[in-house]
A protein has these predicted regions:
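Bimodal "functional hotspot" detector
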Residues: 2-12, 17-255
């Protein structure tokens, strides 16, 4: 169930360079946790690092759903001092059910919050992917002079950035993202493996009706056994109340 998908931990870009792979500079090293087997997560940030036998870094990436709109996923990679470079590399490899327009061989430099990506001409969809992915890092405000607002045409009306598809989640489920819907409202429905509703409600983003706003909400739920499930987000048509702009995020629900 990969119809389309969508969610972010404080990480910063570190200095680096390279001629055959993306390079990053003018940024401090990424933060790490200090307790073995404990993963640190925080709403509103973009990367998670875990200290264990082998350290890893969780990146927030953006690919293209079948309808050509952006979808957010998370991916664990080996711990690195250049997470921005790792992000560009990972953007060339789309998960099943999605596509990417980001070419390989890109170079990255960062100066005072401005990221500059060179090495190949970025088509509009690729630029949108790169802008959204790199601006999850708090040290990056724009890419090649473009902000998220400049590439918003590639974002769906409701973009869930957390949780990611196929995440194993427990109650309460924390959901974050951004939206541009009529009067800033939309609905959600959390379903179990049988499609039975576990929770449903409406959400109000910080802005809407032509302006993209952010949202964050929590869903308490209860299941007896681990099972597949799904989070559905959608808007009700102002004309006839029908479901429009629906996105489905497959999840693994655990007690």
């Amino acid at each position: 169930m990969r119809t389309a998908v969508y969610a972010v931990l404080l990480a910063v870009l570190a200095a680096g360079c390279g001629s055959n792979s993306p390079s990053v500079d003018d940024a401090p090293p990424p933060a790490t946790t200090t307790t073995a087997t404990v993963t640190t997560t925080q709403e509103g940030t973009s990367a998670t690092t875990t200290t264990s036998a082998e350290k890893s870094l969780t990146l927030r990436l953006y690919f293209l759903a079948p309808d050509g709109e952006l979808a957010a996923v998370s991916r664990d990679v080996a711990q690195t001092q250049t997470p921005g470079a790792a992000t560009l590399r990972e953007l060339t490899d789309a998960p099943t059910g999605m596509t990417t327009e980001v070419p390989s061989g890109l170079q990255l430099t960062i100066r005072q919050g401005q990221a500059n990506v060179t090495g190949a001409k970025l088509k509009p969809p690729a630029l949108a992917q790169v802008v959204y992915a790199l601006t999850t890092f708090p040290t990056v405000h724009s890419v090649n002079g473009k902000t998220r607002a400049d590439v918003e045409a590639f974002a769906p009306p409701i973009l869930v950035e957390q949780p990611s598809p196929d995440d194993n989640v427990t109650s309460p489920l924390h959901v974050t993202g951004n939206a541009n819907t009529f009067e800033a409202t939309f609905n959600y429905r959390l379903e179990d493996a049988d499609g039975t509703s576990l929770a449903k409600n409406f959400v109000t983003a910080t802005s809407g009706s032509g302006t993209r706003g952010t949202f964050g909400f929590t869903i308490p739920f209860s299941v007896d056994t681990p099972q597949d499930g799904a989070l559905r987000v959608f808007e009700r048509s102002a004309e006839d109340g029908s479901v429009v702009h629906e996105r489905v995020i497959p999840l693994r629900l655990s007690p």
